[in-house]
A protein has these predicted regions:
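Small-residue (G/A/S/T)-rich helix-start motifs and N-terminal tracts that mark the onset
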Residues: 1-126, 135-152, 157-283
Length: 283
């Protein structure tokens, strides 16, 4: 499988249109499932990034404690406090939603991992899995891996190694092969790193994105990336296109912060830079 650079012009061509009659209901309705006592901010970063990427409605399913904490930071989000059964709540909300991001800050409690595995099988809309959600998927039966064609996985090298059952060094030494193998198994994979690689099942090539710099290597940056890609899944882009466009904007947002120095960049600043990055891409 050859590896080809993904261009700015190609990214611009994927941007959803902005018709005059656009309203929040047709800008994509996204569900974010995540958060835990240890990582209450992760799903908030994903939700913020989705809003900054143009999503019309973002709902957050988490514990009541996490929802309350996030609501103080993001009043624009619809909150779904845990009613005791996260899977049931998500599936009940599915008819009014267009896509889901599962995993940011979720933690590795047994019940949380079970939610991810249940949603992988039962969630009826496009799905992105990140963070501890990827840890959960490493325990999914082999036959279930191939059950979706509308999912995006966003692992770093360590998470990719766990999913493949190989060492991190093996992934690092042949990132293209690792991305290709993951894509054939799971559908569409964005392998984080420098460069980022996007590969998808049945693709004749993989794409390389080299716009990101050290300013993106901060806590929460991956949660921002997940929310950005999730927004485009909710707007109707195919998994491959959502991953490519989201990764492009994530890199461009980071580049906008670079003149101020790469030290001390916050993930929330990357999320806030998505909006001007998208406007620049349209110009």
């Amino acid at each position: 499988m050859p590896l080809q650079d993904f261009s700015r012009a190609e990214a611009a061509a994927l941007l959803p249109g902005r018709p005059a009659n656009m309203h929040k209901g047709n800008r994509g309705r996204l569900l974010v499932v995540g958060g835990s006592d240890r990582y209450p901010g992760a799903p908030a970063l994903s939700a913020l990034a989705a809003l900054r990427s143009g999503s019309g409605v973002v709902s957050l399913l988490s514990s009541s404690v996490v929802c309350a904490a996030c609501a103080a930071r993001l009043p624009e989000v619809v909150y779904l406090p845990d009613g005791g059964d996260w899977t049931r709540t998500a599936l009940n909300e599915a008819p009014s939603l267009a896509a889901a991001v599962v995993g940011p800050g979720l933690g590795r409690a047994a019940e949380s991992l079970s939610v991810v595995r249940d949603l992988w099988v039962r969630w009826p809309k496009p799905l992105l899995v990140d963070g501890d959600g990827l840890f959960a998927l490493s325990g999914v039966a082999v036959e279930a891996c191939f059950s979706r064609g509308d999912a995006v996985l966003t692992p770093h090298e360590g998470e990719a190694a766990r999913l493949l059952g190989i060492s991190s060094d093996a992934v690092r030494n042949d990132r293209l092969s690792a991305a290709r193998r993951l894509a054939e198994r799971w559908g569409c994979v964005l392998l984080k790193g420098n460069p980022t690689i996007v590969a998808w099942r049945g693709g004749e090539m993989a794409r390389r994105l080299s716009w990101g710099g050290p300013e993106l290597s901060v806590p929460g940056s991956g949660d921002v990336l997940s929310g950005c890609i999730g927004a485009f899944l909710a707007m109707g882009l195919a998994a491959r296109d959502a991953a490519l466009l989201g990764a492009s904007l994530h890199g461009m947002a980071g580049a906008r912060l670079r003149p101020g120095g790469v030290d001390g960049v916050l993930a929330s600043e990357i999320a806030d830079a998505l909006r001007p990055a998208m406007e620049a891409l349209r110009s």
